[in-house]
Amino acid sequence: MSHNNQYNPPDLPPMVSAKEQTLMWQQNSYLVDSGIHSGAVTQAPSLSGKEDEEMEGDPLMFDLDTGFPQNFTQDQVDDMNQQLSQTRSQRVRAAMFPETLEEGIEIPSTQFDPQQPTAVQRLAEPSQMLKHAVVNLINYQDDAELATRAIPELIKLLNDEDQVVVSQAAMMVHQLSKKEASRHAITNSPQMVAALVRAISNSNDLESTKAAVGTLHNLSHHRQGLLAIFKSGGIPALVKLLSSPVESVLFYAITTLHNLLLHQDGSKMAVRLAGGLQKMVTLLQRNNVKFLAIVTDCLQILAYGNQESKLIILASGGPNELVRIMRSYDYEKLLWTTSRVLKVLSVCSSNKPAIVDAGGMQALAMHLSNPSPRLVQNCLWTLRNLSDAATKVDGLEPLLQSLVQVLASTDVNVVTCAAGILSNLTCNNQRNKATVCQVGGVDALVRTIINAGDREEITEPAVCALRHLTTRHADSEMAQNAVRLNYGLSVIVKLLHPPSRWPLIKAAIGLVRNLALCPANAAPLREHGAIHHLVRLLMRAFQDTERQRSSVATTGSQQPAAYADGVRMEEIVEGTVGALHILARESHNRALIRQQSVIPIFVRLLFNEIENIQRVAAGVLCELAADKEGAEIIEQEGATGPLTDLLHSRNEGVATYAAAVLFRMSEDKPQDYKKRLSIELTTNSLLREDNNIWGNADLGLGPDLQDMLGPEQAYEGLYGQGPPSVHSSHGGRAFQQGYDTLPIDSMQGLEISSPVGGGGGGGAPPSAAPTSPYSMDMDVGEIDAGALNFDLDAMPTPPNDNNNLAAWYDTDC
């Protein structure tokens, strides 16, 4: 017979001769002891020869052409071929319908490679699947029919007065609810669900309660079941079970409520009305981590977007328990769900201090190095929301170090949160400022700003944090130098112009002012164009304020101040002039400022009703008047009159700067002019002394300065913890310096609202639109009282950037 007409059994590999097939099957079936006679364990021979070294010499394993030793005759081989053919139907039957074979019958296998199923085996797979589907369908139908017939009787038994009967019925229903068909039948019977709810509400029998609530738990995995439970009034009954001492009952109740809260409309309100929040907070004292994870997730669902729920959690002691969980466990899902609750509560002004007082900042900081990104993100969000209430908290050194490290993350949200937290925690806190500087925070923040590009959600808080670090603490000069050494000056100056928005520009102005305090930064800032950009911003903001002033004068109405992106243009005027004031200390910078034709604006600002603007204008004129050219331009612009008027200002800083400018302008004047000016300055000083309303009260200041300061200036200006109001001695309007509450995304926080007090002209604080979410730090020093004499043999020393009324740009604010 030719090779092409050779017969190949369908379940053997093709292209093998009949003799070779028989030999292979014979080896598989006969040459290996089955264990029936010898009792040895049945095993398939190794095809690689590695399992039995004695098989290495067997030529059959490697070369079928060599044949077998001459142990079998041709007749024996023919018999084996015949047996193989005769058992084919049995092999098919065994593969497709194994349950029809009699026990004890062995069918020889024809599988050569265990990794390659035979044709029969491949054909058997769909038939087995079909068989199982038919069996399942029959069972499903049987279950459904059984449940449908049994439900009416079971309802009667559940309503029986005998608790034993109720218990037995509840257990039967529980068993039925474990199968899909009967579970659907129970769900479709409102009477059955109502009977189960009555059973858990009225029964005192533990087994009845456990079986009934277990059934409701099984039903709650399906939307139809959730609706049935809700309509049957199951939520109050389930909430009642949250007081059960039995673990299984508690588990069934809380998981059923959890499913309802997740997927059933109206469940949240029903749980709140049933007192579920209080009971859930009590359950936080347990120690089963998986149980606690469900409870905390329920609390998060109930508290999200509902202020009343947040206050109930607070009144029940929730913050303390939640912080305890964050400190005590390492189960990731529990930590994640708990951090979600804390995140929701952290936007509540009442819960925020409670969480901080409970040690929430430290507890959340423990998990910033956790490998779970979702946990780290939630902790950072929560810390950001809490950070404005934690500016006075001690022991945050580990948190600050972690935040500096987190700034290197590639996750935008992580970096945004870390920068915002650092901005708030370094506000008005010298210890935190020093800590951040010592752990490389300045370098990290500069790199963050460079890498952020135009992502203002990162650059604004990072710039605010740098502004805090560059003023009012022992390492501030080091921080000012570090920004330059890390190539940050050019990047920061670029933030002063588009596409930056006004809140970022305002923050950058304050940072530039602080950086200019370092003499080594004066020239680089000039070379990078800082003066040009500041002057441009000043002119733009000044024009806007003048336009607004003209509009008010024309219409006679009280129009609100000029705003852009929530920033008052008066703040930009004040900040830019203040920064130019510091930059003008350097002679080359003064020359460049004179060339910008901006001195007329400085003179006009002397008439402004906002005292801080008057002060910074007088301050920059004081520096510019140090050069003869500058003094001449100032006089030509008509500054003598307003400066003379400002000598009588109750704001000591304004008066002193005005006196200094007038003195410098008088250097080339005749002796008679100098004498009249000396009398004017001396008279003004005496008037201040005569009008001293403090008497002999000791404020801890030099006697001359104490005599010249009013009460609001002494307390708010020198020792205030927040930005005070800027008031005018001429009865001008108060100027809002602090920041109102400004939520970020769905989260509230990041601000410190400051009391706005009246001084001098007094007045209630106006409502001002929020300008930035980041808290600001007061930068206030002391004026050298000994220099405040007006003997014209020596020019009066101007305030050394230590202003009675701190301006926003001159602060961490």
From Swiss-Prot:
GO cellular component: adherens junction; cytoplasm; plasma membrane
UniProt protein name: Armadillo segment polarity protein
GO molecular function terms listed in the Swiss-Prot or TrEMBL record: cadherin binding
Keyword Repeat on entry: yes
Function: May associate with CadN and participate in the transmission of developmental information. Can associate with alpha-catenin. Accumulates through wg signaling; arm function in wg signal transduction is required early in development for determination of neuroblast fate. Arm and Abl proteins function cooperatively at adherens junctions in both the CNS and epidermis.
ARM repeat ranges per the UniProt record: 139-178, 180-221, 223-262, 265-304, 349-387, 388-427, 430-471, 477-517, 587-626, 628-667
Phenotype upon gene inactivation: Development of anterior structures in the posterior part of the segment.
Keywords recorded for this protein, A-Z: Cell adhesion, Cell junction, Cell membrane, Cytoplasm, Developmental protein, Membrane, Phosphoprotein, Repeat, Segmentation polarity protein, Wnt signaling pathway
Modification after translation, per record: Phosphorylated on Ser, Thr and Tyr residues. Level of phosphorylation varies both during embryonic development and from embryonic tissue to tissue. Sgg is required for phosphorylation and wg signal negatively regulates arm phosphorylation. Hypophosphorylated form of arm increases in steady-state levels.
InterPro entries the record matches: ARM-like (IPR011989), ARM-type_fold (IPR016024), Armadillo (IPR000225), Beta-catenin (IPR013284)
GO biological process terms on file: cell adhesion; segment polarity determination; Wnt signaling pathway
Cytoplasm among keywords: yes
Biased composition range(s): Low complexity: 765-775
Principal place of residence: cytoplasm
Its membrane topology: Peripheral membrane protein
